[in-house]
Amino acid sequence: MRVLMVAQSPIAGDSRILREVAALTGAGHVVHVVGRDVPEGFTLEGGATVESVSRSAGLRGGSGPAVGHGQRGAKVLVQRFGRWLLLPEHRLRTEKQWRTAAAATLSGLEPFEVVHAHDFNTLELAAAFASRWSATLVYDSHELWFDRALPGRPTPLWRVRGRRSELALARQAAVVFTVSDGIARRLRERGLPDVRVIRNTFPRPEVAPSLPSAPTGLLYAGRVGAGRDLPAVVEAARLLAPFPTLLMGSVDPNYRLDLGSVQKVPETSIDEVDRVLQESGISLVTLTNTCENHRLALPNKLFHAVRAGVPVVAADLPELRAVITRYHLGTLYTPGDGASLAAAVRSLIADYAGYVDGVRAAGDELNWEHDAEVLVSAYSALAKPPANAH
């Protein structure tokens, strides 16, 4: 089938979309992606094509260091209050501007048989073009969209109306995908009967992971920004010193944090992250307990650690707890509590070999080859004519 994927995320860095594209082209589908800020010369696997629609970068702060000592003073407080007040409208405006530009791009394309919407901020656009082309709509909910912790002033009415809109639009989809059992249950409770889970797992490694007999450090590899519980990481690093704590990842604009004894290391390729994870021996999967989306999340870094064969210390949130305890992947800490995080690290070190064995065994199930089959099977069913067709 001819498949159009639509996403407002930067495609080059969205591993879920890249893996889904590869799985579908590998199954014989023709895939075109319209995404955000695609780098010049960027290509996709399997002959899939991609084109870019740019989006406003958002409200910008000062030009000071992104990770370091926070700025203070009356002027800074006024600026922060202004951002807090205006950010919700600005976020909606930039997303709408992207959809308007993307609609013009889509209008110039030949019709597709399937329109695959990645996240709610593309769902209305995707549904409109699926209807125009008499195509099948697929909704891929990477997050529990209206239950996220967002910067800026509270917007309770937007959340209530948004959930209603999401339900009305998603009911037009032939199938809905999401990233965890917890989010799937919540979407079903809200009225979507067919929700299937495709976790953000990684392909199995070609070579079995090699780890030290005892861990030599902690690694946080992921986005550096609000909601990642990094102040707790900094406090735990102080309590665990001189045991090294490393931080690797892109830094959100305007995010300020005094890293203390945490060592910032350069970003690198996914394969190189595997190596650093394996050399350190422990992966940090940290989140704040500030929203339902976090409580039901299964972050990429959990499955990256499984691919690398590395045990985790993770936030004690319902969905993370369920997976980590089921597979014996590591230990849990109370979000926001650096002392709890440090204690969880010590507990993991005390039974390190046992957790390594658990991660190794979990790799047989927690891998992209397993999850890709859910996607490919669903598309195979979409390609079949209805039983009553003549």
List where the protein language model places each region:
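Short hydrophobic beta-strand element within catalytic cores of glycosyltransferases
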Residues: 283-286, 304-314
